[in-house]
Amino acid sequence: VSVIDFRTAPERYRHWQLTLDGAVATLALDVDPAGGLNPGYELKLNSYDLGVDIELNDAIQRLRFEHPEVGAVILTSANERVFCAGANIGMLSASSHAHKVNFCKFTNETRLALEDASAHSGQTYICAINGPCAGGGYELALAADHLILLDDGASSVSLPEIPLLAVLPGTGGLTRLVDKRSVRRDRADFFCTVEEGMRGKRALEWNLVDEIVPRSKWQGAIAARAGEIAATSDRPASAAGIAFSPLERTIEGERIEYANLSCVIDRDLMAANIA
């Protein structure tokens, strides 16, 4: 079994574009279709696998700790036709049960890390939804603090897992709709049965998003909202960030050695000893 390497850095990202502009950062999803973590599937329509989320998690942590000057983060798509189609179905169908379980756990932890950066580090996330935003894509958007939907007749939000796959959303979709956004339970249940999702005014009326903006005003509205939110942040903008140095480690058999700790895996006991 190949070892999944969680070490990355912005200059090595294949799926995200990270830009910094004073107090505002932008994370734009631009998935490389041929950049799957494993062979056998294509990451179409800005869908994601574990490799995409490893980069997202790295970016969230770096923005939080390396960049105290950043008070607002715009989460958007670099693809004009789609925001995010969610978890890649080809990847899921080709993966073992264990990989799918760990994939879902990691993606959940990444979204929780985003929310934690907002709750405890004063870094507000704005999701600028500029295309169809489905399944795990909308679940990622729901982790943000403020959702802005492009009102162009094509951009939409949806949780189509039930009508398309006969499974419940697996990355907090229903929970965040009801508990975080206070969407009525009957509406949340109905929304999950609508394959095409909802657009424009209806999405706003149901509190699925916070704002809708026409294409003619899109760029200006996103920049203005991000600037307003960044101006209210209490982050210590003049402080020095905590630089993430490369995490070096060696692997020999079932032993992993880092500079300050070691880990020995016992596969028979399904245990890991860390010292």
Regions found by a protein language model. Name each.
Residues 1-76, 180-199, 204-206, 210-275:
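Intrinsically disordered, low-complexity segments enriched in small/flexible residues
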Residues 14, 46-49, 84, 90-93, ...:
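Generic, ordered loop/turn and secondary-structure boundary motif
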Residues 22-29, 49-98, 108-128, 150-154, ...:
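A structural preference for short, pocket-lining loop segments at secondary-structure junctions
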Residues 28, 34-38, 82-86, 158, ...:
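Short acidic/His/Gly/Ser-rich catalytic and metal-binding motifs that mark active-site loops
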Residues 36-38, 93, 100:
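A generic structural signal for short coil/turn motifs at secondary-structure boundaries
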Residues 42, 88-91, 140-143:
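Short, glycine/charged-enriched secondary-structure capping and boundary segments
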Residues 68, 84, 120, 135, ...:
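A generic fold-level signal
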Residues 98-237:
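Conserved catalytic cores of soluble enzyme domains
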